């Protein structure tokens, strides 16, 4: 055991050396949850409002507020597009959730999603130079049922204060209707990160994993375990980017998706799943045992693990198999177990394991790119462009089986990705503003550097306290004690 650094970079070495791989994985999960709870309590959340304009003297309040600000109001009244230039709207994202599917914890009640939504805004700012506001709402109707129309109405009413909307942690099937309606009826881009963001980064991982495995996307057999918002969107983007739907099988809680699933066909709310029933699994494979035999890729976004994905399934896969076990907060199978079962490349959604396939490397750059050109929507082409941008960036700096996509520490990836997304928005005809790629790249780079410098300055000057070492030590001791029993 070594002393744990404040950066947590030597976390594995801070646990007893006699811990097995399984004990270590369990201990890290317990530690991170305990430290998260204590740190959130210590800081009282993660986000605050900081002024971006100077207070040269109190007379300037007559400029920033009344009477001077009246001119701003009337100018926006006469041309609503001026709101993007005369306010922070052009760089502001609403992070909207009804908290009905928070990570793997289910319905956490409206305020229960605040930790995740603030976290989203936190990452947007530091990684993408984008301001975010957490908005957790109650979507229940008078009968107590969660009604997607309540979310739709809320977003449509508040869209005029924001440059984009990030939907988060909305349970299915409501999430499908909410996204599809808002994408068409809002004047600003609406992005569902659980679906589109996860799909974008997963596609990036698949692109580079296939390069390392020496396989083509059009040739491989793909199994998707779980058929929620994430995996259904992943399937759609994979097919759009060249995967063969006839070589693809998806599973939900009732079994494999295929054209004989009358239960899905009969429920109009699950129209996205039915589309996949019609186009995938033409031979009506019914079981995971059969689907996994000879499969090249497994993408699992289902129930938090471990032991949700069986080692026997992985053993039956093709040579140089690829396993993405991306449930949060615990993957369906731990990486060490998947490797022991013969997987060539393993990815999870967690940053403390190799190959973090997590939307944290996607949404900051994607939203920044959309905002810079004032896009009206984020198209599937823009998401696919972001995936290829991430894969290309990683390949240029070098990839290997434990490093297939960029990570959050690679600051340069975000302006690179943002610029590619902006260019695709222009190509798709959804941009209000035209920039060159270099202009987009430089603007994103400047804004991201500014956001990081601001945070570091607040830390250096003591306006943001460092985490107490004792708090970290207590969380570590707690985790070790829980595992040792």
Positions of the model-derived regions?
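Short, ordered loop/turn segments at secondary-structure junctions
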Residues: 98-100, 108, 137-140, 169-172, ...
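Rossmann-like adenosine-cofactor binding region
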Residues: 272-344, 350-352
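General beta-strand structural signal in soluble alpha/beta enzymes
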Residues: 134, 166-169, 190-193, 250, ...
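N-terminal ligand-binding/catalytic initiation module
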Residues: 2-188, 424, 451-485
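Adenosine-phosphate binding glycine-rich loop
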Residues: 193-194, 213, 321-437, 458, ...
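Glycine-rich phosphate/diphosphate-binding loop of Rossmann-like nucleotide-binding domains
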Residues: 103, 111-128, 192, 200-303
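Solvent-exposed alpha-helices and their adjacent loops that cap or buttress functional pockets
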Residues: 83-89, 125-127, 157-159, 183-184, ...
């Amino acid at each position: 055991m070594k002393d744990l650094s404040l950066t947590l970079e030597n976390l594995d070495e801070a646990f007893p050396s006699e811990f097995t791989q399984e004990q270590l994985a369990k201990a890290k999960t317990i530690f991170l949850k305990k430290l998260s709870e204590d740190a959130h309590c210590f800081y009282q959340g993660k986000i605050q409002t900081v002024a971006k304009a100077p207070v040269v003297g109190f007379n300037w309040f007559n400029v920033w507020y009344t009477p001077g600000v009246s001119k701003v109001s009337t100018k926006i009244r006469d041309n609503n597009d001026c709101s993007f230039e005369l306010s922070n709207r052009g760089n502001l994202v609403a992070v909207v959730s009804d908290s009905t599917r928070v990570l793997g914890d289910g319905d956490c009640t409206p305020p229960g999603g605040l930790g995740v939504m603030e976290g989203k805004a936190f990452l947007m700012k530091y990684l993408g130079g984008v301001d975010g506001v957490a908005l957790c709402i109650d979507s229940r109707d008078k009968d107590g049922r969660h009604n997607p129309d309540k979310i739709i109405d809320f977003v449509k009413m508040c869209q005029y204060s924001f440059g984009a909307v990030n939907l988060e942690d909305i349970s299915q099937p409501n999430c499908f209707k909410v996204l599809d309606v808002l994408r068409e009826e809002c004047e600003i881009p609406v992005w569902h990160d659980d679906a589109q963001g996860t799909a974008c980064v997963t596609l990036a991982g698949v692109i580079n994993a296939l390069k390392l495995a020496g396989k083509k996307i059009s040739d491989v057999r793909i199994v998707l375990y779980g058929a929620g918002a994430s995996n259904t969107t992943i399937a759609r983007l994979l097919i759009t980017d060249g995967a063969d739907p006839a070589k693809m099988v998806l599973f939900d809680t009732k079994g494999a998706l295929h054209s004989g699933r009358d239960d899905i066909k009969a429920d109009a709310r699950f129209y996205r799943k039915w589309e996949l029933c019609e186009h995938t699994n033409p031979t009506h494979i019914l079981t995971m045992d059969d689907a996994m035999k000879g499969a090249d890729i497994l993408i699992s976004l289902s129930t938090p693990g471990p032991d949700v994905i069986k080692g026997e399934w992985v053993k039956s896969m093709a040579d140089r198999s690829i396993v993405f076990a991306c449930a949060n907060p615990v993957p369906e199978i731990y990486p060490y177990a998947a490797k022991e079962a013969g997987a060539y490349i393993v990815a999870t959604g967690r940053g403390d394991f190799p190959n973090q396939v997590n939307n944290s490397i996607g949404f900051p750059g994607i939203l920044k790119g959309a905002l810079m050109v004032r896009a009206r929507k984020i198209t599937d082409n823009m998401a696919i462009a972001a995936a290829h941008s991430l894969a290309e960036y990683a390949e240029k700096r070098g990839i290997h089986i434990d490093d297939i996509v960029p990570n959050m520490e690679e600051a340069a990836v975000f302006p690179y990705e943002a610029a590619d997304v902006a260019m695709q928005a222009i190509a798709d005809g959804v941009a209000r503003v035209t920039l060159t790629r270099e202009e987009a790249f430089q603007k994103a780079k400047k804004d991201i550097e500014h956001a990081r410098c601001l945070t570091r300055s607040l830390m250096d000057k003591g306006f943001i306290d460092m985490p107490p070492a004792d708090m970290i030590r207590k969380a570590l001791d707690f985790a070790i004690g829980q595992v040792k029993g």
